[in-house]
């Protein structure tokens, strides 16, 4: 069978698995919908969070950004990852402690202020819409390549699938679906990384290939041949103030 047929089979099987998990995880009360009955194990929650991070934005955009910008792309990676860490340490634990389901409810009750609640609502909407726009664009690109449709149709298909998980299973369905996606994404990352490392350096472990071979020098030379700065050159076209604000943003 051709690579296209194998791709179709594997993607179809994985999607059928996601749909089955979403159906089995359907909920009937608000606690199950918003906080997955507070019964998801820590390891599963970690896997789901990892799958969220390894989303379309990371899998497509972040990988391309670092590949194109080299060391300069690390400022986006550090800011993005740092935001996840701050959220996990400074906000997420206290939502459960306060018994709240949403960030605006928590902020409003914590600071006894409806103004703070409104500010939290505006911030949540702004951040969510910005993130979702990039995510859905990535979903549209993936479906357009896979189903041979235009990107707009791919976005619509992705919206329908996401709505199915969110409406039927709430956070419980989304969490367990993300756990399954985590496994798929890890494998999808490892296969090309191992293959490229083996072909270029003969070392099948990407971390060792990057450390103990001349792959960095080759990347630097490719960048120079294309008229760009070296792959490992740090912040060649940015001031430290630019770097600081991009990382914070």
Features from the language model and the residues they span:
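Loop-to-helix junctions at membrane interfaces in multi-pass transport proteins
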Residues: 2, 37-40, 44, 61-75, ...
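Transmembrane helix-loop junctions in multipass membrane proteins, especially transporters and channels
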Residues: 23-30, 92, 96-101, 143, ...
């Amino acid at each position: 069978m051709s690579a296209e047929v194998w791709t179709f089979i594997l993607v179809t099987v994985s999607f059928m698995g996601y749909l089955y998990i979403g159906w089995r995880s359907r909920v009937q009360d608000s606690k199950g919908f918003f906080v997955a009955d507070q019964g998801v194990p820590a390891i599963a929650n970690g896997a789901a969070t990892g799958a969220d991070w390894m989303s379309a934005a990371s899998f497509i955009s972040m990988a391309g950004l670092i590949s194109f910008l080299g060391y300069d792309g690390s400022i986006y990676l550090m800011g993005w990852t740092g935001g996840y860490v701050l959220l996990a340490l400074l906000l997420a634990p206290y939502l459960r402690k306060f018994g709240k389901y949403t960030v605006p409810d928590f902020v409003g009750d914590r600071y006894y202020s409806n103004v703070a609640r409104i500010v939290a609502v505006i911030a949540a909407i702004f951040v969510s819409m910005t993130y979702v726009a990039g995510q859905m664009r990535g979903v549209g690109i993936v479906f357009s390549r896979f189903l041979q449709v235009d990107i707009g149709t791919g976005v619509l298909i992705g919206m329908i699938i996401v709505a199915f998980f969110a409406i039927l299973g709430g956070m419980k369905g989304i969490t367990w679906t993300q756990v399954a996606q985590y496994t798929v994404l890890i494998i999808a990352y490892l296969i090309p990384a191992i293959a490229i490392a083996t072909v270029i350096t003969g070392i099948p472990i990407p971390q060792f290939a990057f450390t103990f071979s001349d792959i960095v020098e080759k990347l630097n030379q490719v960048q120079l041949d294309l008229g760009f700065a070296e792959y490992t050159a740090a912040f060649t076209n940015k001031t430290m103030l630019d770097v600081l604000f991009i990382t914070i943003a």
